[in-house]
Design a protein with these regions (language model features):
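The beta1-alpha1 cofactor-binding region of Rossmann-like NAD(H)/NADP(H)-dependent oxidoreductases
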Residues: 63-74, 106
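Substrate-binding pocket helix/loop in short-chain dehydrogenase/reductase
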Residues: 100-101, 105-110
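Residue(s) in the substrate-gating loop at a strand-loop-helix junction
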Residues: 143
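Active-site helix of classical SDR
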Residues: 124, 159
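SDR active-site lid
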Residues: 176-240
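Conserved glycine-rich cofactor-binding loop
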Residues: 18-19
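Conserved glycine-rich Rossmann-like NAD(P)H-binding loop of the short-chain dehydrogenase/reductase
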Residues: 32-49
């Protein structure tokens, strides 16, 4: 598949662009000729990333805090004045969790939901008029944790489950307007997501999970992701053997629970 045909000259707003899957998306999309709006909270990392991308002058850095929805209209106005259109909104920004449900503070629960769910959907609502105009596509980077719960990820899993319900509904509603939605469910991918995850007390987890260290290389993950986007798939599972758990849960739920309780939380 020639991905240049799908992304060349297209305007892509990407959240969570400064690291992990978002950073690799920036690299690969720029190689296909896309024009990128690079967003995350870390402006310094975004500026450093932009300098490494192909066609540097075509991209802009736009710092964005998903917990500050009041800033979205102004950011949206800036993007549309700059580019005149938005073809893809890739919702990759978010925060993970490494703490038990019983010990995680209310602040942690609310912060995860605010960033992963409320900020995500409110940005989509802000950008939706432009996507209707361009007959564009929303890409939501969820997780296999959006398909089943797992140790130390209660609020994270809840936020991802919520995204699936919201965007499955939105996809049905917006199909007649020409807007498509692709849900991406990565499994164990070699990114620093666990390092930046929130512990039960709200501090950073601060270490790399073994599951992440031994996970699928992020370049392969993103390559598969972009192929799914180009095909306008409604949903794609990306990872190694762990993604088989989704099918196992659906077909043999009792066996699924016996297997999953034996897995390492990290």
């Amino acid at each position: 598949m020639e991905l240049e045909n799908n992304f060349e000259g297209k305007v892509v707003w990407l959240t969570g662009a400064s690291s992990g899957i978002g950073k690799e998306l920036s690299i690969q999309l720029s190689s296909y000729g896309a024009k990128l709006i690079l967003s995350s909270r870390n402006e310094q990392l975004l500026n450093e990333l932009k300098l490494t991308l192909q066609n540097t002058a075509e991209h802009i850095v736009l710092p964005l805090d998903l917990s500050d929805a009041s800033s979205f209209p102004e950011k949206f106005k800036y993007v549309t004045e700059k580019y005149g259109q938005i073809d893809f909104l890739i919702q990759n920004g978010g925060i993970s969790q490494r703490g038990t449900a019983s010990e995680s503070s209310e602040e942690v629960v609310r912060k995860i939901m605010e960033v992963n769910f409320f900020g995500n959907v409110l940005l989509t609502k802000t950008v939706l008029p432009a996507l209707r105009k361009s007959k564009g596509q929303i890409v939501v980077v969820s997780s296999i944790a959006g398909k089943f719960g797992f140790f130390l990820r209660s609020s994270y899993s809840a936020s991802k489950h919520a995204l699936h319900g919201y965007y499955e509904s939105l996809a049905l509603e917006e199909e007649s307007n020409g807007v498509s939605v692709t849900m991406v469910c990565p499994g164990k991918i070699n990114t620093p997501i666990s390092t930046n995850a929130l512990a039960a007390d709200g501090n950073k987890h601060g270490s790399m999970d073994h599951n992440q260290e031994t996970g699928m290389p992020v370049s392969i993950c993103v390559s598969q992701l972009l192929k799914a986007v180009a095909k306008q798939k409604r949903e794609v599972l990306i990872g190694n053997k762990e993604i088989k758990a989704v099918t196992l849960k659906r077909l043999l739920p009792r066996l699924f629970w016996r297997v999953i309780r034996k897995q390492s939380p990290t």
